[in-house]
Amino acid sequence: HHKTPRRQRQMCIRDRPYLAGSTNLIFKNTFADIEYILTTCAENGTRFEIECYDIGHLYTLAHFADRGIVKPPFFIQSVFGILGGIGTDPEDVMHMKRTADRLFGDQFHWSVLGAGRHQMRIAAMAAGMGGNVRVGLEDSLWIKPKQLATSNAEQVTQVRKLIEGMGLEIATPDEARGMLKLKGADKVGF
């Protein structure tokens, strides 16, 4: 695995103080906070994308589901390769999927995102396991090793070729909206 030398990281931080904010930031997400967010959003008809950065997040979702605070079907986005979260080994991907299967049965849609250079490899693994994938510049700036992506569209085109090359089909936008029980742009007030 390629690691950025400590000195180079320090230079980036010194040169760009706004990047340094994440090195000592506490991300507060208490059970009371989560319950408030879930309850408030549900009251307003919000559909949740539940991002799970580690196995414990699946158990947190199960806790709130068992209490009736959040209702299935769930859209679970497993996130791989973020510092402090689950890794990018194939065993990690399988463990997240198996745990979600055990906890939620057929009451969830599973999608993945792989951060940084792991994006396409994680997408391929999940697609092969029947999962959905998410790609884009929010998650990775790279299209391939040492080459920056030019756009989200370039990454979507690449993952589409990858998935179709595996003999799998891509959902249409209407199929995806139906799967996720979304209204569609023509039925919202903005």
What are the language-model segments listed below?
Residues H1-I13:
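Single conserved hydrophobic/aromatic residue that forms the stacking wall/gate
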Residues R14, F48-E51, P72-S78, F108-L113, ...:
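Hydrophobic faces of well-ordered beta-strands that scaffold small-molecule active sites
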Residues G21-C41:
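Active-site glycine-rich loop that binds ribose-phosphate moieties when present
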Residues I37-R67, K71-V79:
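Hydrophobic, aromatic-enriched interface-forming segments
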Residues L58, P72-A123:
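Hydrophobic protein-protein interaction segments
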Residues L61, A126, A176:
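Conserved, mostly hydrophobic/aromatic
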Residues N132-P145:
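Glycine-rich phosphate-binding active-site loops on the catalytic face of alpha/beta enzymes
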Residues K144-L168:
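C-terminal helical cap(s) of enzyme catalytic domains, especially alpha/beta-barrels
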